[in-house]
A protein has these predicted regions:
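HotDog/MaoC-like acyl-thioester-processing domains
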Residues: 1-11, 91-100, 104-150
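Hot-dog-fold acyl-thioester-processing enzymes
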Residues: 1-85, 137, 149-150
Length: 150
């Protein structure tokens, strides 16, 4: 499926994305390497044995990127002009290696662009859940969306 245009989004619309992903150790290691993040909570098994989790946790920005990325095919693929910002980000529970993440997206609000007659702003709520239905990530994202071409 391709993304939707501005006019196709309705406030309250909800997407339960069918694409899921089981997060691997390699995902976490590669993300940490690519972002130059040496945090021992993500990389050092021995260090993590002494934490409240007892094991490594997945980088939260990987988790957020996954939750939003999974939404693209159903919402913004080929129809967005870019992200304008994210707010209210939270990580209620950690993600561990081998957790399976699913995503839900809701349309919170939308409005016409004040500067671009061919575009509008859609504000999404993105939710990520693990296989135990625990929320692992949330954010509010403002997307600059194309209007249907004339």
């Amino acid at each position: 499926m391709t993304g939707l245009y501005y006019e196709q989004f309705d406030i309250g619309m909800e997407f339960k994305h069918s694409l899921t992903r089981t997060v691997t150790e390699s995902d976490n290691l590669l993300f940490c390497a690519l972002t130059h993040n040496p945090q021992p909570l993500h990389l050092d098994e021995e260090f993590c044995k002494g934490t409240e989790y007892g094991q490594r946790i997945v980088n939260s920005l990987f988790t957020l990127g996954l939750v939003i990325g999974v939404s693209v095919g159903d919402t913004t693929l080929g129809t967005t002009l870019g992200n304008l910002g994210m707010t209210d980000t939270r990580f209620a529970n950690p993600v561990f290696h081998e957790d399976t993440i699913r995503s839900v997206t809701k349309v919170r609000e939308k409005r016409e662009s004040k500067s671009r007659p061919n575009a509008g702003l859609v504000i999404f709520e993105h939710y990520g859940f693990n296989q135990r239905d625990e929320e692992v990530a949330f954010c509010v994202r403002t997307a600059f969306m194309m209007k249907t071409p004339l």
